[in-house]
From Swiss-Prot:
GO terms for biological process: translation. Pfam families: Ribosomal_S14 (PF00253). Part of the 30S ribosomal subunit. Contacts proteins S3 and S10. This is Small ribosomal subunit protein uS14. Binds 16S rRNA, required for the assembly of 30S particles and may also be responsible for determining the conformation of the 16S rRNA at the A site. InterPro entries: Ribosomal_uS14, Ribosomal_uS14_bact, Ribosomal_uS14_CS, Ribosomal_uS14_sf. GO terms for molecular function: rRNA binding; structural constituent of ribosome; zinc ion binding. Disulfide bonds: none annotated. Zn(2+) binds at C24, C27, C40, C43. Keywords: Metal-binding, Ribonucleoprotein, Ribosomal protein, RNA-binding, rRNA-binding, Zinc. Its cofactor is Zn(2+). It comes from Ruminiclostridium cellulolyticum (strain ATCC 35319 / DSM 5812 / JCM 6584 / H10) (Clostridium cellulolyticum). Belongs to the universal ribosomal protein uS14 family. Zinc-binding uS14 subfamily. Binds 1 zinc ion per subunit.
Length: 61
């Protein structure tokens, strides 16, 4: 889990627009963010295994 202070700090609008960055909507993780879903890869994996993300299935080739 991300530090509460960093999550709150990130929610404020930054002084310069280039300082803005994405965080996971579930756990607040700043790295490995998947834009299409708005969550990090770890939360994505958990939700995909539970079947809570529609249209996502395990790849097989």
């Amino acid at each position: 889990m991300a530090k509460k202070a960093m999550i709150i700090k990130q929610q404020r609008t930054p002084k310069f627009s280039t300082r803005a960055y994405n965080r996971c909507k579930i756990c607040g993780r700043p790295h490995a963010y998947i834009r299409k879903f708005g969550i990090c890869r770890l939360c994505f994996r958990q939700l995909a295994y539970k079947g809570q993300i529609p249209g996502v299935k395990k790849a097989s080739w």
